[in-house]
Amino acid sequence: MQITFYGVRGSIPSPGPSTVKYGGNTCYVLVELKNDQRLILDAGTGLRSLGQKFIRDNTGINIILSHGHWDHIQGHPFFAPIHHPEQTNCRRKHRNRSRIRELRLFDN
């Protein structure tokens, strides 16, 4: 398993020379497993460039949005795979917070 933090900037994207070390994108994390499954946690601004890569590779993706704050969703409309039905599969939508605790990722 490999976990990569792509967006750690906070509520407002702020790319530029002063943010090069840690990046300027808002929240999103990529989890890659050995069986080629991928999970994206949240949908911050850096998601756009990752989406371009996944479109080229024709890679399937699972996305979990932790909550609806702007810094966690603002990259979502620009994530190209959501506009390609063959790469998108919406399985669950949880409205009950206690139910989310029961969700087991990558269970077969």
What are these regions (language model features)?
Residues 1-108:
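Binuclear metal-dependent hydrolase catalytic cores
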